[in-house]
């Protein structure tokens, strides 16, 4: 299937590793030009070097929790490529704590990184899409639907806010032919997850899916690219869960074992 991405320009925030890197690579392989950003210069340069073999890539150090840096990044991308068609808001952080353990600085960090960055990214993208149309994809989380109580108390509520924000911006931008969609990944084998969540808990969560494993970043990237493409031209204010069936049954492990018994 031709996704209609050849010649288009896609921005992927947090594109130096994990889901962001996989998404940037997927866009490039579909013929798009890609701009990535990260706060960490060394990681960004390494990612840019690895991605160059797939197609045109632009990289810039950006703190997406700051509005002006988003706006400047969008301007630089537009000047570099001459257009801006797609924006993927991918940056996030977890904060592995109970609610009572967060101090004011940590709360602000969570809000700035997980929520404000998405607001600013949508604003920055819209400045360049309102005349020619485009697509925005926000990366939320399964935690938006399932409580993360006792593990990362603020993460789920902030991701829920992204889901609502997606629908709100979809309504505000629709007259300009700008679509806004959202993806809710389940547990994914990213550097962020591995650093924030103990290995034993990661294993338990993987076994709690119908597919009995964590997702690979590439398995999240493909739906993101689809939502941003012309193949999804009638989709907006849409949130897609990609979780290996984690939220579809009360006891995924039990369902898996019973089905396995029947097959045997």
How should these model regions be labeled?
Residues 9, 16-18:
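Conserved glycine-rich cofactor-binding loop
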Residues 61-73, 104, 218-219:
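The beta1-alpha1 cofactor-binding region of Rossmann-like NAD(H)/NADP(H)-dependent oxidoreductases
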Residues 98-111, 205:
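Substrate-binding pocket helix/loop in short-chain dehydrogenase/reductase
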Residues 122, 158, 166:
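Active-site helix of classical SDR
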Residues 127, 171-175, 233:
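Alpha-helical segment proximal to the catalytic Tyr-Lys
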Residues 141:
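Residue(s) in the substrate-gating loop at a strand-loop-helix junction
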Residues 236-264:
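Short C-terminal tail/terminal secondary-structure segment
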């Amino acid at each position: 299937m031709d996704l209609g991405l050849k010649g288009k320009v896609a921005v992927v925030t947090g594109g130096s590793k994990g889901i962001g890197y996989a998404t940037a690579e997927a866009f490039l392989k579909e013929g798009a030009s890609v701009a990535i950003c990260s706060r960490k210069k060394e990681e960004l340069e390494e990612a840019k070097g690895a991605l160059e073999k797939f197609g045109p890539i632009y990289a810039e150090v950006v703190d997406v929790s700051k509005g002006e840096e988003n706006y400047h990044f969008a301007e630089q991308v537009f000047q570099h490529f001459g257009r801006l068609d797609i924006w993927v808001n991918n940056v996030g952080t977890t904060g592995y704590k109970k609610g009572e353990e967060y101090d004011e600085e940590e709360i602000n960090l969570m809000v700035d990184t997980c929520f404000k960055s998405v607001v600013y990214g949508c604003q920055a993208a819209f400045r360049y899409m309102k005349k020619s149309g485009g697509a925005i994809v926000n990366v939320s989380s399964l935690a938006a639907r399932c409580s993360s109580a006792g593990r990362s108390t603020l993460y789920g509520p902030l991701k829920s806010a992204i889901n609502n924000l997606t629908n709100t911006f979809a309504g505000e931008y629709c007259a300009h032919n700008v679509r806004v969609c959202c993806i809710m990944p389940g547990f994914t084998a990213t550097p962020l997850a591995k650093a924030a969540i103990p290995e034993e808990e990661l294993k338990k969560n993987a076994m709690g899916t119908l597919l009995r494993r964590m997702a690979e970043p590439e398995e999240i990237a493909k739906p993101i690219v689809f939502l941003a493409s012309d193949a999804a031209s009638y989709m907006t204010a849409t949130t897609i869960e990609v979780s290996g069936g984690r939220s579809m049954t009360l006891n995924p492990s039990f369902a898996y074992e019973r089905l396995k018994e029947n097959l045997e």
